[in-house]
Amino acid sequence: MSIKPLHDRVVVKPIEADEISAGGIVIPDSAKEKSTKGEVVAVGPGKPLDNGNVRAPSLKVGDKVIYGQYAGSSYKSEGVEYKVLREDDVLAVIG
């Protein structure tokens, strides 16, 4: 993947939902919801502040995150879909 996010943006590779439910039912692709979990694969240099400084990003490559379902923009590279999000669109870091 050759994408470098700018400013306070991060690139997230969505983590696909399970193919089988907890009860053992196979979930067809048409019934799956869009993933809202993913792994950070690239991080921008940080958010430029009004005073000229740059606020360092709080996320790092490898973090597993939860983000809003409709947040960011989709980007496809080599058959893999990624989301480009603002750091503010990330709701939480998972364990």
Swiss-Prot record:
<comment type="function">
    <text>Together with the chaperonin GroEL, plays an essential role in assisting protein folding. The GroEL-GroES system forms a nano-cage that allows encapsulation of the non-native substrate proteins and provides a physical environment optimized to promote and accelerate protein folding. GroES binds to the apical surface of the GroEL ring, thereby capping the opening of the GroEL channel.</text>
</comment>
<dbReference type="Pfam" id="PF00166">
    <property type="entry name" value="Cpn10"/>
</dbReference>
<dbReference type="GO" id="GO:0051087">
    <property type="term" value="F:protein-folding chaperone binding"/>
</dbReference>
<dbReference type="InterPro" id="IPR020818">
    <property type="entry name" value="Chaperonin_GroES"/>
</dbReference>
<dbReference type="GO" id="GO:0051085">
    <property type="term" value="P:chaperone cofactor-dependent protein refolding"/>
</dbReference>
<keyword id="KW-0143">Chaperone</keyword>
<dbReference type="GO" id="GO:0046872">
    <property type="term" value="F:metal ion binding"/>
</dbReference>
<dbReference type="GO" id="GO:0005524">
    <property type="term" value="F:ATP binding"/>
</dbReference>
<dbReference type="GO" id="GO:0051082">
    <property type="term" value="F:unfolded protein binding"/>
</dbReference>
<dbReference type="GO" id="GO:0005737">
    <property type="term" value="C:cytoplasm"/>
</dbReference>
<dbReference type="InterPro" id="IPR037124">
    <property type="entry name" value="Chaperonin_GroES_sf"/>
</dbReference>
<protein>
    <recommendedName>
        <fullName>Co-chaperonin GroES</fullName>
    </recommendedName>
</protein>
<dbReference type="InterPro" id="IPR018369">
    <property type="entry name" value="Chaprnonin_Cpn10_CS"/>
</dbReference>
<keyword id="KW-0963">Cytoplasm</keyword>
<dbReference type="GO" id="GO:0044183">
    <property type="term" value="F:protein folding chaperone"/>
</dbReference>
<comment type="subunit">
    <text>Heptamer of 7 subunits arranged in a ring. Interacts with the chaperonin GroEL.</text>
</comment>
<comment type="similarity">
    <text>Belongs to the GroES chaperonin family.</text>
</comment>
<dbReference type="InterPro" id="IPR011032">
    <property type="entry name" value="GroES-like_sf"/>
</dbReference>
